Amino acid sequence: MLDIKFVRDNPDAVKENIKKKFQDAKLPLVDEVIEKDAKYRECLKEVESLKAARNKLSKANGPLFGQLKKCDDEAKKAELQAQIDANNAAVKADADKMAELEAEEAKLAERIQEIMYTIPQMIDPSVPIGPDDTYNVEAQRFGEPVVPDFPIPYHTEIMESFDGIDMDAAGRVAGNGFYYLLGNIARLHEAVLAYARDFMIDKGFTYVILPFMMHGNVVQGVMSFPEMDAMMYKIEGEDLYLIGTSEHTMIGRFIDQTLDEATLPLTLTSYSPCFRKEKGAHGIEERGIYRIHQFEKQEMIVVCRPEESADWYEKLWKNSVELFRSMEIPVRQLNCCSGDLADLKVKSCDIEAWSPRQQKYFEVCSCSNLGDAQARRLHIRVKGKDGKTYLAHTLNNTCVAPPRMLIAFLENHLQADGSVTIPKVLQPYMGGLEVMVPVHKK
């Protein structure tokens, strides 16, 4: 979310940014919010003026009451009483006018906030311009893509060969978008999460166990309305939502806080289940675990000073690359274009893993710099050495999300005989197992 003062002072830049994000329908909102803000500030000014007048009249009545009490002249007493009554009438009139203005002020403030929540964050100059993800730009590749000389089955078929997945039972229990993982596949899932946790701790991040639900004001603080509608499950009858990712409550931890600058940067990592409706263009897969309603994830976030966020952005996505390469999975970095950025994001990139079966890359991680957008909504401020406060910057990045990571892992480590090799970094988390041998060979 932008600062209203910035919008007031830079309307053309804000409009140009909206055009770069291909959201032209929002252009009239810039002029509307500037107009509403001017009216809001005029209301504030009038209210303050009326308060001053009311206080002056109320103060004037004090001496008049004193004179009235001491006065013996009936004519003079009547004159004093008339002045007191006139002052009281003026005070009441001012109070009535103030009530009207304050009601208008509240109405304007609500609309201003609604618009400000809709106007997108200013994107970084380095962001590629394009309307959708087909305009995302490959930046770098890491590792040589695997080109197998044998056919790679669909990932659920690989899992089924290990008796490792039961989607039919999950469908009977909860419908599409859920799964049971079993045996070595379930063990591999947990091994990846445990390894990712230790990997991030070794990077100096603090491990966090956090709430898996949050209040509506936190939801509005961490994401845009379209994201909220497409993703979040609400608990019926409660002001609670299931988290779509652990970054939500990791960032939410600092709502309405003023942080000591000396404590920054705050670098946190957490495991959590994630719950998503997955409404929209992609939806839930009829089969497979690429896009589902419930999954687990290891996440990383940073709360830092504004001048540090660009450097942390680079560090975060490189953590994901290093993690995947340590598990011998080829990946690439893809810079997200303007139209593919959520409204709160300043800059974002995807880390995509190589799929030997499809002979193409697919998204496994997403890294984002949100600038001061979340901090402004959640009121996360920093107190500097000079005593002045300013808004923090926040960033987040997927460390690993095992459902998608498992797809990449199984395809890249599948052998011609149907077995799956375990990289050395994961073997301690798999009880020393070096190779997973299928139960059913096809």
Question: Residue locations for each model-derived region?
Answer:
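N-terminal alpha-helical targeting/anchoring segments
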Residues: M1-P145, E160, G164
